[in-house]
Every structure is written in structure tokens, then in C-alpha cells.
Amino acid sequence: MEHPVKVNDILIVQAGTGTDQIGRFDIMVDTDLNAVDTYTWSTVPIDETHCPRDESLENFIMHYKDLTDKKYGRLVTRFARKLEHPSRIQETPLGSLVADALQESLGIDVMLMGSGAIRSYNLGPVVLYSDFTECFPYDEAVYMLPVTGEQLTRMIKRFLREEAFTGEHTEFYQLSQGMHVVWSRSAQCFKELTFDGKPLGAQQIYKVGVCKYHYSSLKPFLDITLEEVEANGRVRVLATSYRDVIEEYFMMHQHLKREIEGRLVIEE
């Protein structure tokens, strides 16, 4: 746009597209009328002649770039192979590993790890801190819920409701090792539901981990109330940062790998 266009007493300009030039708009304002008195408009090519390098500014920027590169460029771990998380509504290798890391580190029976909190479709085999934080951008506490087998069954059934598979917004979870669930969508029931190879004991207490976001919405997400949980025992905060727990686990265990094991099988 060579000249400004005035529309409803508003000056409109455009410096073109791309990064070849920038626009310069010098405006003199009449403070008595609170209006533009005079103006000049020009486009300035972005080149060495019109935009010389500012070495002081470059050095200032590079100082902080070096610091961020040092922080985010460090190695966290190496997996045996790349681990995938292609969909939030299925068991995934990366989801299983994350659930296992929290279960083992926090000493609980079952970890329900929100699938949506894993933000990368894959991770590894070389995992830099930048990759790690991109995959796990959220950082929350983990709560331990003492629940009965009957209640855990109800919680799992809740996130496997049909809306999860028809595109509606629901919460879905990755299961830690020991869990084996076979769910029939057509019959809307469990064909199998075991923990460590045994059926869940209806009145047996299981220590189940959930992150703060899910803890704050237990009824809509998992069909259980905090009052029901507290009737079984005290709810405890096991960690204030699940991301720190996962990072430490990854750093302490090199060449980790996971496969689709059948922890969660969805049948039509």
C-alpha cells in the first residue's frame, strides 16, 4: 500500500507481506483536537543499509539464548526406541510408560494418567528437556485416592462411556501396569477387569493416583465424589509436581521401552 487510506477517520496502512520490508508511520497529533494533524508514511527495506546490525542487542539476546539452550538442550534420557501416543482414547506405549513411572515412584496400586496431559504424538528415542517439557507442559500435584474395587470399576466405566469414542469432549486415562480391562462398546460392559491377574475385590481398598485437574472434578470425570473417597480413608498428596517425578524416573532409568500390552482393550 503506497498511501494510507482513511476510513471513518481512521488511517489504515499495510507494509505488504513477508519480511522484505517494514512500514514507518510518523504521526503528529493535535492535542487540542485529539486528532491527527500531519503524517508521513513510507516502507523501509530490511537490508544492511536501512537496518544495520546492532551488535550490542545481538549480544544481549545471545546471552539469554545460551542460557535457555543450556537448560532446554540438556539430555533427560534415551529410550530403547521412539514411543508413540497417537490417540488419547486408546492404550499407548508412551502413556503406559508415564503411568508406570508415577505408579512405581509414588508406591500406589493404580495410576490413572490423563491422556490429554500428554501433548506429543511421540517422544524419543533421544529425549531432550525441550522435548520433555513440550510433551508434558502441565505440572500438577498427584493425589492418592483410597477406593474400593466397586468404586474403581465405576470410575473406569465412567471414562469408557460411549461419548469418549464419538468425538465429544471427555476425559480419558492411561492405565499403569497390573491393570487389564476389556470393554465392549456394543454391550456397554466389561468383558474382563482384573488387577495383577485377579478380579477386583468389591470391598478391597486400592490406592489410586490422579492428578490435581482430575481430582478437582471427580464426579464429572470419574463418577465418584470426594465424600465417598474420604469414607475409605485419608486422601493424600503424594507429589507436588508430577512432571518432576516423571523426569527423575526417566533420568534414573535409561533405555526404557513399552509396547501395547492389552492393558486396555476396546471391542466394538
Model feature map: region roles:
Residues E2-V5, V182:
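Short, exposed beta-strand/loop patches in secreted or surface proteins that constitute
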Residues M1, I12-A15:
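Active-site neighborhood of phospho(di)ester-bond hydrolases with catalytic His/Asp-centered motifs
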Residues V7-D9, L106:
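Short, structured coil segments at secondary-structure junctions
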Residues V5-K6, I156:
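Short, function-defining helix-loop hinge/capping sites that tune catalysis or transport
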Residues G16-S105, D109-E268:
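Catalytic centers of hydrolytic enzymes
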